[in-house]
Structures are given as C-alpha cells and as structure tokens.
Amino acid sequence: YPGSTNHVVEIDPAVTQIAYEQLGLSPATTIKTFNMDARQFFIRGIPGEKYDIVIGDVFNGRSAPYHLTTREFDQLIEDSLSPKGVYLLNIIDDYRRGRYMPSIIYTLKQVFKNVHLFNVGRAWEDIRVSTYVVVATNYDFDFSAYKTPTLTPAGKLEPYGRIYDGDLDIYLADRKAVLLTDDYAPTDIFIAPVLARLKL
C-alpha cells in the first residue's frame, strides 16, 4: 500500500536498527517506528489518529505479553480504529486442546461486534500446534466466500479457512475460555502446554 501511512510499534530499538541497516528498509518511506511498549503507545495515542488496520504480532508461542491480551487493551485498540477498522492478531496455539487462543477470542468478543478465526486449510481438524489469525472488527464484513490461497511450508497452495461463527461459539464454550482482564490474565499458564508440545 504505497499511499498508506504506517506506524510500527517495536519495543526493542535494536530490531528497528537491524531493519534499517541490515534488511534494507529505506528511511524515505511513510513507515514511522515508535520504540516503546504497544500498550503505552495506544494509551498516549496520536491526536486525531484512527487506524484502518492494527496488526498484533507479538504472540510467538514462547511468551505471552499478558497486558496486550486483556479486555482493557482491546478497548484501547477499539477506540483507535476507524469505523471499518480491523484488528488482526497472529496467534500460536493448539486448537483442540489449548486455552490461550479461546480466551483471547472470548475477551475480544466482549469489546468487538465481530470476531473471526482463520487458518490455512482446515488445520483445526488436526491435533497440533499451529498459527492462526484472529480478526476483530465492529464492521459487518462478508467473509463467507473468503478463500485467498496461500503457500504452505511444503510448497502447496491452500486456501485460508474460516471457522464459522456458530462453531466458534461452541468452541469457546468447550475450551472453557475465560475473560482476560488486567486483574486476571493467566496467559503463561495457558501457553505452558504449547511450549511442552513444541519442546521449546
């Protein structure tokens, strides 16, 4: 999106330095980096700024910054979005056995009108740890025919799959999802079994 303005929030200045010095990111772009914690960024805010897309990519399967998973943080994001704005989260979990992702989804549903879950193909039918994308928005997007193909690690082209809303509600109930708040967010406990299965 060459005509867009992009704000990148990266807590580690060394990562920003590597992007410019080693990965060839030109300083002559519309990308502006803020070296600070993401929650502090949204608390301070930029006057008059509303985002069309916010991407959360801090959940790596090894650690869980709990303060970025709570209802209070989700509300900060919701307040920062444009009317058709979308919050995308990249999450690693075991769909069939994990409690981390269902609790994040359940918490998002307390703030956003629409929450959807996507994965490559139908990975939720397998018993394994996988990467998922959670989409939270107040706008009524039509995802019914969403089948954008993506290249798998094995080199196979597969469509993204979406778990239907009714099935998602059943999933949250079956997985005993909990509301994550600033006062109660046991994300490290939820992630521990994932770490054990990944043997990290």
Predicted region positions:
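Soluble small-group transferase modules, centered on the S-adenosyl donor enzyme superfamily
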Residues: 114-200
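Non-catalytic surface loops within mature trypsin-like serine protease
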Residues: 13, 93, 138-140
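Short histidine/acidic/glycine/proline-rich micro-motifs that form metal-
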Residues: 93-96, 123
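The AdoMet/dcAdoMet-binding core of the Class I SAM-like
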Residues: 1-88, 95-101, 109-111
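Alpha-helical scaffold elements adjacent to nucleotide-binding pockets in ATP/GTP-utilizing enzyme cores
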Residues: 103-107, 132
